[in-house]
Amino acid sequence: LDNNLPTLGTRMESTWAYMTELAASTKYFDYIEYEAEYAPYTEPDLENICRASELYGCATVIKVDRQNRYYNAQRAIACGASGILFADMYTAEEVKETIDAITTSYPGGGIFGRPNRRLGMNGTGRMRMSDYRKMTDDVVKMIMIEKVDAFKNLDAICKVPGVDMVVFGPFDYATNAGWEMDKNAKDLDEVHREMIRIALENGVQPCVQLDYNTNVQYFYDLGVRHF
């Protein structure tokens, strides 16, 4: 993100860290996304997933539920996650509150206290507070755009300080709009393209999750660099 370079990730629902290690060891992927919204897990599971990714210089993104997102996101960051993907957002106001929850409580910052876990391990036994601030600031904040209201509020959401990326969720969007995936495929494509356009106009990177690589060029031509 800092160097405007493309990224490629893959998704996991298994807590078996060996599966994460297999994916990361291919060197094909820049990040592994663990779907904590769907799969059961413990905090040691998240630590092991992050460790397995780190073995091969791979980042880890954790997707969290809406209801308990503050707690789960804070714990995921403490476990070593490089990014958090927040599901089921609706308004810019709640996005701001969500970003504040994982931003260190420095003057003018958020409400996140010192996460004394893997995040704070730098080999010295004592990390400067400014280092904690930088580490939490560097966590990639990603927002799912999968509700009709979120799409309507997209311009304002993209203007929330700290929002790095947005991701379209076609299945949830179709459900929320009262659509069907097959009958309203063109409508969903139109919303997706418009999401990409609005995000890029605001300097926020769209991330597109694909089941197949056949559409990569199409989205690349729209300005997407993260898959």
Protein language model annotation of sequence segments:
Residues 10, 35, 84, 98, ...:
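Conserved, mostly hydrophobic/aromatic
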Residues 1-60, 66-67, 162-163:
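Conserved N-terminal beta1-alpha1 strand-loop-helix module at the mouth
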Residues 163, 168-189:
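Glycine/Thr-rich beta-alpha phosphate-binding loop at enzyme active sites
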Residues 1-11, 124-138, 193-194, 200-201:
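N-terminal amphipathic alpha-helix/helix-capping segment at the start of soluble metabolic enzymes
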Residues 43-69, 102-109, 134-136, 184-207:
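Alpha-helix-loop-beta-strand connector modules within alpha/beta enzyme cores
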Residues 20-25, 62, 67-82, 86, ...:
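Catalytic cores of alpha/beta
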Residues 71, 81-161, 175:
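Conserved anion-binding
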Residues 5-9, 30-31, 57-61, 82-83, ...:
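Structural preference for beta-strand elements that scaffold enzyme active sites
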